[in-house]
């Protein structure tokens, strides 16, 4: 039978790992630093920068207490070691206790120093100060980031301990102990590595993860790496102003929907075209409101009264990209081999059509 000390050590090790790197089950139970210190941290949506100033500091303090917690637990799990009486403990345990006390002491000193003068000494505040105008301070930059973070059009991905956020102006990486920030107009982005995982909890298909180096031309801003699923690469590029170079010649695998959209577009371009009457004025696509509608559904695959497809009488209201996305969204995600031959309803009138019925307006 295992001794209580061994059992406690294994249990505490599991607890410490789950506390530092909390899985979804631990997060849902509220056993994280963010949940335990929620009243002090405030709202991330209301004040993103201020929230992470406190979160990084609180996380450092909380994690620094773990060795001391283990020592106190061993006082009860192994009473024969006399850990409750420091002068009776062995030399090894005295050394462990010394470092277990020193770690939170140093962390507390750092936290106190960072919080002085309204968090002016925090590493994040110093990074933001680099981007501040001469007549303003880091708080003006923080206010800009807070405003952009509240917008719904930002790009955000990743687990809470390794999040990547891209706004109109900023590229942000959130880690356990710090926040990396770089201004889009000052950065160079390079794909440096890729890893492929054959099995993932959310999909039965291989998943590719890309590592992208974010380097600022400003020497006072430290470079950092972001990691994301290759399926999100296209969305990231749309949000970035700077191009992404591929120094490692990495073959980037697109998502299944992106691959289908390319095939859908190439097949539609081979269909017959449609000419609108001179009196008809085309309006913006109701899907994206950015591109002029350039698609008309006309039954071409079979005779008018044959087959599953139906004639659509809607005026042109969609662009090719949005129609392709609509077509893909109506498919069985587990059977992509059936996508090209399937029939879907018109997004407006519900008349069924296939790829052969999609005509580009010339």
UniProtKB/Swiss-Prot annotation:
InterPro entries: TM129. Residues 79-94 are cytoplasmic. GO terms for biological process: protein ubiquitination. GO terms for molecular function: ubiquitin protein ligase activity. PANTHER family: E3 UBIQUITIN-PROTEIN LIGASE TM129 (PTHR31322:SF2). Belongs to the TMEM129 family. This is Transmembrane protein 129. It comes from Gallus gallus (Chicken).
């Amino acid at each position: 039978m295992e001794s209580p000390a061994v059992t406690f050590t294994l249990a505490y090790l599991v607890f410490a790992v789950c506390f530092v790197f909390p899985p979804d089950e631990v997060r849902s139970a509220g056993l994280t630093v963010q949940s335990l210190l929620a009243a002090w941290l405030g709202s991330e949506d209301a004040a993103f920068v201020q929230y992470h100033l406190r979160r990084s500091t609180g996380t450092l303090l909380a994690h620094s207490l773990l060795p001391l917690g283990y020592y106190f637990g061993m006082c009860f799990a192994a009473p024969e070691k006399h850990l409750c009486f420091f002068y009776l403990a062995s030399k090894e345990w005295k050394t462990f206790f010394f470092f277990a006390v020193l770690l939170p002491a140093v962390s507390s000193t750092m936290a106190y120093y960072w919080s002085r003068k309204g968090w002016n000494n925090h590493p994040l505040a110093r990074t933001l100060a680099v981007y501040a105008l001469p007549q303003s301070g880091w708080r003006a930059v923080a206010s800009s980031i807070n405003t952009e973070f509240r917008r719904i059009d930002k790009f955000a991905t990743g687990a809470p301990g390794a999040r990547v956020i891209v706004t109109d102006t900023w590229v942000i990486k959130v880690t356990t102990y710090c926040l990396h920030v770089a201004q889009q107009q000052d950065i160079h982005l390079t794909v440096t590595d890729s890893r492929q995982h054959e099995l993932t909890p959310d999909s039965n298909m291989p998943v590719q993860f890309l590592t992208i180096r974010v380097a600022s031309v400003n020497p006072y801003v430290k470079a950092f790496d972001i990691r994301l699923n290759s399926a999100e690469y296209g969305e990231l590029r749309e949000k970035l102003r700077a191009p992404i170079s591929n120094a490692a010649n990495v073959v980037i695998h697109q998502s299944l929907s992106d691959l289908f959209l390319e095939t859908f577009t190439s097949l539609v371009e081979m269909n017959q075209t449609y000419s609108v009457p001179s009196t008809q004025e085309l309006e913006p696509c109701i899907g994206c409101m950015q591109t002029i509608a350039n698609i008309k559904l006309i039954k071409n695959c079979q005779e008018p009264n044959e087959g599953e497809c139906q004639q659509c009488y809607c005026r042109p209201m969609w662009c090719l990209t949005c129609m392709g996305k609509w077509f893909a969204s109506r498919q069985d995600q587990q059977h992509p081999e059936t996508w090209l031959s399937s029939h879907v309803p018109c997004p407006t009138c519900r008349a069924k059509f296939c790829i052969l019925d999609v005509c580009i307006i010339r």
